[in-house]
Every structure is written in C-alpha cells, then in structure tokens.
Amino acid sequence: MSSRTRTTSPDTPARVTIRDVARAAGVSLGTASRALNRSGPVSEAALQAVERAAKALAYAPDPIAQSMRTGTSGVVGLLVSDLANPLYARIITAVEIRLQREGYAMVVGNTHNSKAQEELMVDLFRRRRVDGLILGPCEVERADYLDQVSRDLAVVAMDRDFGAQGSGVHVDHFRGAYEACRYLLDLGHTRIALMTSDGALRPGRERIDGYRAAMAERGLAVDEALVRASRSAMDLSFSDALALLSAKSRPTAFICLGTRILSGVLQATRQTGHRVPHDVSLICVGDGDLPQLYSPAITAVSWDLEAVGTAAAEILLRAIGGGEGRSQAKAQGGQEVRLTTQIVPRESCAPPPAGMA
C-alpha cells in the first residue's frame, strides 16, 4: 500500500503556530494560549513576552481553530437579489462599515432573485458557520422560511416579509408610491403608469397598494394596463415602456424603479420622440447618480440607503453579540425598523399636454 505525504514547497514559508510563539517567548503552550486569547491569568512579563514574540513572528490565529474553540466565526453573510443594483451597493457599504467597527467580516452573495439560489446560498452560509445573516428581497418571500432559518441563526430581513418573532428593516414603499402618485395627480395627470416588482415582493406590493390608494382618494379607477409589475423588476425595461408610450391612450406620467427600469423608460421616450417633461413626466423610485445627472434631472422618491444598512447591522449585532445584548434581543423578540421616504423635486415633472390629462 502506497503512502502519501504532504510536502511543502521550499518557497512557501510554514505557517507560524502558537507553539512557535510559546517557544520564542520562553513560556509554556498554555501560557501563550491564555495570553493571546485573554482567557486566563498571565503575568505581565509573560504577556509582554508573548506579544513581542507574536509580533516578531507575524503570528495570526488559525480562524478555523478559533471558530471551533469559541463557537463563532466573526463572519456575517449578506444576500441581495442583484449586486448590479447601485442602490444595494450603498446599503452593502453601510452594513460593512458598521460590522467592521465590531470586528466582523462580511461575505456578500447574489441570489439573482431566485428562491432556489437563495436557499442554496443560505445553506452554504450555514455550513460555513456564519454568525448571522441579512437577507434582502427575493423571488418568493415566505415568512415561515425565515422563521425556520432563524431557529439556529441570527437573521435580519431587509425589505421583505418575516414572521412575528423575526426582525427586519423596511422602507415605507407604500408612502413613497402614494406621495409620488399624488404629486403627479396634483399636476393634473390621471393616466399614470407604475412599473415595479409585483406583490410577491414586499416593496412591489406596498408600491402597488400606495399607487391604488392615491388614485382611489381622487375617485379615479385604475387602468390595469398601466400597472406593469413583474416577478423580477429586471424583466421590466425598454419593451414595456415602449408598448405603453406607443398605445393610442398612452400614459402622460411614469413612476418607475430608478435602476434598469428607469434607463428603459428614458430609452423608450427617446425612441418615440416624447420629451421629458413636456410630453411625459417621470418620477423614479430610489435616488442615485442617474436621476441626478440625467438632463432634465429626474424627480425621485428617496430614502436613506445608508440608514437601511446601518440599522440592519445594528439589529444583527444585538442578536449575535452575546452576553447582555443577546439576552435583551431575545427578550424583546422581533424588532422592526421602518424608514420613511421623501419626494425630491427636480425637473422631470410638469402638467400633462393639453387635452391629455
């Protein structure tokens, strides 16, 4: 029977171990371990000797061994539906900044708005023993699924449904769509198109409800042809806007997501020769670079993206922090933070063309 031995390339330095540190410091292995982990009594002289040796040898703890010993990994997972969405980039950055202040690393995953992909990634993160998860919207949102995941893992929902014992951070998308629709109604528009994700996702459902509420408040029936909702917001783009603008009874205003959908609507207005805001008014949901840099600048439904990320991280840190913080989090049960929206008026809205309200 042949045997296999693991060899190390002479160009690859051997990993410095705690035994090496103990030997260099002239102390026992147990003393070195207590000094490095601050886990027991160590004399000041021994502590300084161990610290000097660790620094001289560039010692770094083995994260796997450390995780097995402490039961924590120091890593948090974050899942979003579309990493290409610039709004997510700002949220992710805010989460990372807050976690790093407490010594946590973050691993980001992309679900591509797929329930199957989300479940695969959640399972992967759990097997990698992350300390907690932040989950953004996904294709099919089931509160019972989040309850199941959170039985043995700290979970924070971000703009998605969750059970009574769950925790989440949400933007008031109902109010955002309601105020956007009222803004256009006050200008005289009645044929207002809404382009968003559908009711399977919390943000889409709230926007549709807010839009309907504003129309009903004015005694206006909703033309269902003007409500374009899709399981994936990415499916809504140029072709949908082009179809709406080419219709005989076209909309005079749009409320649309301020990412790829906004780009599709702007492309459709150019192709059909409709000018913003002279022929078509436009409000985007979610503010960013494109709405501000486009000419004319696009009126937007805005909210504090950094606050979303920071709040999600804060809730998760309380849940996984251990000690008093963890006890308080469990005693309080589910926590919810709801953030408000505001209309940022710019140059993309005007009264409808004469005779086309």
Label each region the model flagged.
Residues 1-12, 24, 56, 94-102, ...:
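Bacterial carbohydrate/catabolite-sensing allosteric modules
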Residues 1-72, 356-357:
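N-terminal helix-turn-helix DNA-binding module of bacterial transcription factors
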Residues 24, 29-33, 68-84, 183, ...:
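Short beta-strand segments enriched in small/hydrophobic residues
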Residues 44, 48, 57-124, 128-132, ...:
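Amphipathic helical "hinge" segments at domain boundaries
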Residues 63-64, 117-121, 142-145, 236, ...:
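Short acidic active-site motifs
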Residues 107-109, 134-135, 194, 302:
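Short catalytic-loop micro-motif centered on adjacent basic/acidic residues
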Residues 112-115, 136-141, 260:
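Short beta->alpha connector loops
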Residues 132-145, 157-165:
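Acidic, Gly/Pro-rich loop/turn segments at junctions of secondary structure
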